[in-house]
Structure formats: structure tokens, C-alpha cells
Amino acid sequence: MAIWQGASRRLSTGAKVWRAAKKHKREMGRPAAETQISDRIKRKIVRCRGANLKVKLEKTNYANVFDQANKVCKKVAVTKVLDNKANKHYIRRNVMTKGAIIETEMGKAKVTSRPGQDGVVNAVLLTE
């Protein structure tokens, strides 16, 4: 079944709202990418509106971590997800989203990119 992002047919009172127009393709959505930690890297290219392309990162084990103290950015391995404010169940499934705290070889880092839409995991090293 398709994900539809249009307005509901019901008001908060329960009354039915009659549509002025039918459903359009532009109102469709897609399921979230939910980027997970895995041994292999898996990307999915999706056509967007206006014939543009969006790269969805589905599986990865690396992140570009920026160290603010030394002004250095390194590609390091990600071991696990420590905290994720988006959903508490993402922690045990090792799902990375923007704002997630991840454990890397350099230490704890906070994800600053949107892996499901950018196709890459960028993070900032957290100071202890």
C-alpha cells in the first residue's frame, strides 16, 4: 500500500471532509531508509520530483568524523549506535539518523547529516 501525505478525510471531531480534488501522485511518500550498521555499503538511487536523483544510504560501516579541536576530518569505522532521539528502538537495531550518537574508532560522535537523504554519514566528534 502506498504512503500518502495528503490531508486526512476526517476532522478532529470525526466529521467527514469531502475532497475538492482527487489524490495526486505528488502527494505520495516513501518509507524511510533507516540506515543501519553493516559490513557492506548499500546505496539506493531514487528518482525524485523534477527528474532529480536522491541517494539513500541503507547500510554502511563508515562515517566521516570531524574533530573540532584539531580541525581534521577522517573516515573511520562505526561500531554501534549509543543513543538516538528519533526512536528508542533504533538503538538496538543500530539505525543511524540525524542527531544519533554513535561509537567510532575516534570516540563518541554525533551524526550531522541525513544518511537516508544525503547518502553519506557525517559526524562531529563529541568532547568528553
From Swiss-Prot:
Gene3D superfamilies in alphabetical order: 2.40.10.310
Protein keywords: Ribonucleoprotein, Ribosomal protein
The name this protein goes by in its record: Small ribosomal subunit protein eS8
Keyword Ribosomal protein among UniProt keywords: yes
Source species of the chain: Methanococcus maripaludis (strain C7 / ATCC BAA-1331)
Subunit text: Part of the 30S ribosomal subunit.
HAMAP family: Ribosomal_eS8
N-terminal signal peptide: none
GO molecular function: structural constituent of ribosome
Pfam families noted in UniProt: Ribosomal_S8e
